[in-house]
Amino acid sequence: ELQQLSKQYSNIKLLQLDVVCENSIKKVVKEVEEIVGDKGLNCLINNAGINVLASLEEVTAETMLTIYETNTVAQLMVSKAFLPLLRKAAQLSTGMGCHRAAIINMSSLAASMQLVQANEMFLKVYPYRIAKTALNMITRCLAADLKSDGILCISLHPGWLQTDMGGNMAPMQVQEAIPGILSVLDRLGEKENGSFLDWQGETLPW
């Protein structure tokens, strides 16, 4: 589907990235820099993620570390690598938001510590939800650290979607969530910096 879109729209550039490979990250940063030039990068969406079903009885240290590396550590390393391009974009505008410079970390409702009991269906995904909770802390740290640069950072729950990871039991198709997600991104401003939002723009509890 992406290849078809890139053929239809010349402004869509497809780049391959392995988020857990430092050399791959460096390569993609250079490729993006060649595309955006002096304008910098306005919006980085950290969307990579993996999941393995693992209850308390099934979870292993190896599984925990594998999920944590991809869903948490890699998001921070990718954000760090793209900082020069984000800062370059931030210098060309004012205010806060995707129109200037923003980091969007794709999180999950499963990461909410306050809603653990309300979301018992997620209890069998220890590695995933713990990694996403840690990702939310990265969001908070980046939001505070980069505020002076004019770079916004939020965590976004896109909804439970029918994807390879979400499965066929998910209540929504990707096409249903995209308009809401784009609307949320378009409305982001300083007051949303460091927040945890869902695809409808509602604030979620940490």
Where are these regions (language model features)?
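Conserved Rossmann-fold cofactor-binding substructure of NAD(P)-dependent oxidoreductases
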Residues: V20-D38
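Conserved mid-core alpha-helix of short-chain dehydrogenase/reductase
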Residues: S24-K27, A74-A81
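A conserved hydrophobic alpha-helix of the Rossmann-fold in NAD(P)-dependent oxidoreductases
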Residues: L2, I25-V29, G166
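C-terminal helical subdomain
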Residues: S148, S155-P158, G167-W206
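Conserved hydrophobic beta-strands of the Rossmann-like cofactor-binding core
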Residues: L41-I45
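Short, flexible catalytic-loop segment of classical short-chain dehydrogenase/reductase
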Residues: S112, P158-D164
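Catalytic loop of short-chain dehydrogenase/reductase
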Residues: I50, S55-Y68, V73, L83, ...
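Rossmann-fold cofactor-recognition segment
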Residues: S6-N23
